[in-house]
Structures are given as C-alpha cells and as structure tokens.
C-alpha cells in the first residue's frame, strides 16, 4: 500500500487555529439537470445527478442529453474526478499509445495519472474510450479519497453473492468503499465487472460529498456531511464540519484559513504542498502532506 497523504484523522474535537494552505479556483458549469430532456426527476438518481450537474461535475453528452443510464467511460470518469478536486497539474503520458493529444480527454488523463488515481490497463494502454467497470470506479474513488485500506481489511463482503468476482487487485479498494458506506451494491450484488453508469457514479459521489465550496469568502455556518473545498481565498471560522474536510488539488496559489474549526471526520489535504498544519489540539500527526497536486 502506498504511503497515505491523509494529514489527520480527527475522531473527536480538534480546534484548528489559522491553517494556511494554497488554493486556486475551479471552474463550474451553470446548468441544471432539468435542462436535459432525458433527465427523470422522479428517478432514483434524480438528487445525485442534480447535485453532480449543479456542482459542475457531470456534463451533458449534448445540450439536451445527460444520458444517466449510459455507461461511463474511463476518460469521462477521469474528467469528473479532476473537476471535483480542482486538479491542474499534469504529467507526461506519452507511454500510453492510445491517448492521442488531439482528443478532448488528453489533459484529463494526464491530470488523473499525476494525481495517482489512474493507472493504465497495461504499460502502454489507458483504454480511455472503454467503459469503466464498477470495481475500477471504486478503485479510483478510493485512491482519490486516500482511504485507509488496512483499516477496512476486515470488511465483510459475504453479503454480496458475487464477492468472488472481485479481482484481487481491486479487493482492498472495494472493501474500503463498502466499509466506509460509500457504495451499497445493486440488487444482485456488487457486480464488480459490470460497467458503471453515469447516474451510479453520480450517486457514489453524492454519498461521499455533501457540499462543495467553490466561491471565495468567509463561511461561519456548520457544515452537514463532508465538504470539498476547490477554490482559493476561503476562510472557515467558528464552525463544525460534521463529516470529512477535503482540500482539493486546486489549493495551490491562494490560501485557505481554518479558524476554530471542528472536524468530526477525516482531514484530507491534496493541495497546499508540504505546508504545516497547526492545531491547538491534535489527534494525529499533522506534518507535511507531500501531495503531488500541491
């Protein structure tokens, strides 16, 4: 298992004073799910897809089609992860011969490889246009969230009839996603080898992230669930985050200040490089993160 970049697991009250890390703005798309004629507001996915569109994560296949039940490609998922975390640093991906520079997704694949969420299907193939399987999707999300795979090593998957269909390389990630209650499976089981739909992926992200901060300013209201900050010049002051606090890769050139903030879940920093984290009460090591996006 690779070294984790989680700065602190705060399981009790941790009052952080003046945390300064870098940040940069992330783009969003001002659209509504109801703009798409194939969006069903009564469907099981309605809330999750609406949130994904509202937060600029999920784009339409055209100006009128969102294709919620369509299979998500590996390139599309890379793009959504990058948008979510505000990634901006790319790496050379010339070894992947099937990722042409002329393709819309070339930069997104390069960003995803740099972030560490994506590996090729072989040393020379990324298969960007291929549908992404459910176990691949769980792996990518688990990597992005830096889940502690060892902590979930004993997660019981026996309730899923198709447990044995999970590939050995994906098993730690699947256990972590199920153990963290981020994925619940389909009616017939986890179906790890099936392709994930666009709506299903939106639902997974909706299960994980309760809100996004994309506008500069000061926030002093308690935050329900987990929050992902993906812009700069944000101050959280005198508030409690009920879930995880995630500072995305976009934390690069500006600053984020946490003044008397209580985090009941995990504190994960992708951006901000190796800047120190100063806390009045600290429940885990809060040294430099060494994140590739910082």
Question: What feature does the model see in each segment?
Answer:
Residues 2-46, 54, 59-107, 114-171, ...:
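Feature responds to low-complexity, polar/acidic, surface-exposed segments characteristic
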Residues 174:
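Flexible glycan-contacting loops in extracellular carbohydrate-active proteins
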Residues 213-294:
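Short, T/G/N/S-enriched strand-turn elements that build extracellular solenoid repeat scaffolds
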